[in-house]
C-alpha cells in the first residue's frame, strides 16, 4: 500500500474493537441522528459476514424483528458505532453465513462455544 495512504488510515483505525467472528452474537451501539438530536440505538444479532481489510473492513449483523429478518452492515472503524459488545460466541464452520437467511425458528440457531 502507498505509504501516504497507510499513514493517513492508521490515525483513523479504532483500537477498542473486540475480537468477533461470523456466528457470534453482538450488540452494536449505533449513533442515530434524528433532526438535531443524536441518540444511541442498540442492534443485537448474529454476525453473518465480515468483509474487507484495514479501514474499509465491515461486518453484517442479522436479527429477527417481529418475524421479519433485518440485516445491517456496519464499517468496523466508523465513529458512528459507539461500541460493540460480544454477547455470545457461536460455533460455525463457514466464513459467510448467508444460508441463515433461508432458515427460520430453531433451525436458525447457532451452537454456543465457551471462549
Swiss-Prot record:
Ribonucleoprotein keyword on record: yes
Signal peptide segment: none
Bilayer-spanning residue ranges: none
GO MF annotations, alphabetized: structural constituent of ribosome
Keyword Amino-acid biosynthesis annotated: no
Domain of life of the organism encoding this protein: Bacteria
Keywords: Ribonucleoprotein, Ribosomal protein
Entry-linked InterPro entries: Ribosomal_bL19, Ribosomal_bL19_CS, Ribosomal_bL19_sf, Translation_prot_SH3-like_sf
GO biological process: translation
Function noted in UniProt: This protein is located at the 30S-50S ribosomal subunit interface and may play a role in the structure and function of the aminoacyl-tRNA binding site.
Protein name: Large ribosomal subunit protein bL19
Biological source species: Streptococcus gordonii (strain Challis / ATCC 35105 / BCRC 15272 / CH1 / DL1 / V288)
